[in-house]
Amino acid sequence: MTFKRRNGGRNKHGRGHVKYIRCSNCAKCCPKDKAIKRFQVRNIVEQAAIRDVQEACVHDGYVLPKLYAKVHHCVSCAIHAHIVRVRSRENRRDRRPPERFRRREDRPQGPRPGGGAPAPGGAAAPAPNVART
């Protein structure tokens, strides 16, 4: 019979059995090696109160610690939450990890289409005065 994935959707090579975990979203039982695992990094203090806490802090430059929680998702919840995406038959063979998300200021700034200089006669140039006689 044909098979869809080389690993059968699991990371269990050579093991007979692995323990089950509960999905963090729906509490469904899922094998630990099949579950989609991610670290959720959050601030201890919510975004609205960060400045108030830093102003009230005695130490200058104190960095608030973060909460690191490992979340496990079953396949259906991971697809629904766009943590993983359904890929075509050809793209399923691609075993490279997906491209990492980079913040806007970390991206390389290359030449943009249309050039960086303002066009002559654009919005910044004053309109010619034709009413003179």
Curated annotation (Swiss-Prot):
One of its GO terms (molecular function) is structural constituent of ribosome. PROSITE patterns: RIBOSOMAL_S26E. The keyword Iron does not apply. Residues 87-109 have a biased composition (Basic and acidic residues). One of its GO terms (cellular component) is cytosolic small ribosomal subunit. One of its GO terms (biological process) is translation. PANTHER family: 40S RIBOSOMAL PROTEIN S26, SMALL RIBOSOMAL SUBUNIT PROTEIN ES26. This is Small ribosomal subunit protein eS26. It comes from Oryza sativa subsp. japonica (Rice).
